[in-house]
Design a protein with these regions (language model features):
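A residue-level marker of the well-folded mature domains of exported/periplasmic proteins
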Residues: 1-203
Length: 203
């Protein structure tokens, strides 16, 4: 949606790191794609400069932007909710599951930082959108949204609620690619989706 706002004719090519034997970098090089949104942050097992949104010119990485999580703000709000009694839980027999917390930019728990590759004029535009999201004046998941089959998934005067966003199993009509099948995933990815309950697994 962000890409379409800048260029309505642009296409987003999606590849999944969790698929077995998937050489994403080679595919993007073959297609001439050099603007990439990669993993959100550096991980201990895979230290790399390729994270966040960046331009990859023949192996030279130029960072544009990346998300950041302020865990101090998150835990502060979590503890405050417990002390105030607003923290809730659902019990199912001997199982206890905490409710989801929809804390975004307006809470201070999530933000965005800019890389050296993002010019000052573009930063002004991103800042404008960022402040609009924080104030609730701009909702990214609003307006008419169509899936790859051309079906309307959200009407022009509607906004997807958080549950609908997190449960999205479809891709926008400007996206090239697909959601992988369970059997296409690597063993680590299969374990992740089963533990997180991201998809229903039929044995």
């Amino acid at each position: 949606m962000g890409v379409r706002a800048v260029n309505p004719n642009a296409k987003v090519y999606v590849e999944w790191a969790g698929i077995k034997d998937n050489d994403i970098e080679a595919k993007f090089q073959e297609l001439g794609i050099n603007c990439i949104s990669d993993q959100d942050m550096i991980t201990p097992k895979k230290s790399s400069r390729k994270f966040g949104l960046y331009i990859n010119d023949d192996g030279m990485v130029k960072h544009l932007a990346m998300p950041v999580w302020h865990w101090g703000a998150f835990y502060e709000k979590l503890i405050q909710s417990i002390l105030s009694g607003s923290w809730k839980k659902e019990e199912e027999g001997d199982k206890v599951s905490a409710l989801n917390y929809w804390w975004g930019m307006s809470s201070g728990a999530v933000d965005i930082i800019y890389g050296g590759g993002l010019n000052s004029e573009t930063r002004k535009i991103v800042d404008l959108v960022r402040h609009s999201i924080i104030k609730g004046e701009f909702m990214p998941f609003s307006g008419e949204l169509k899936n790859q089959a051309g079906e309307i998934m959200n009407k022009a005067d509607e906004t997807l609620d958080p549950d609908e966003v997190i449960e999205m199993d479809w891709l926008l009509d400007n996206v090239v690619g697909k959601v992988p099948e369970y059997d296409e995933l690597s063993d680590d990815s299969k374990l992740l989706v089963m533990n997180q309950g991201i998809i229903d697994v039929n044995e």
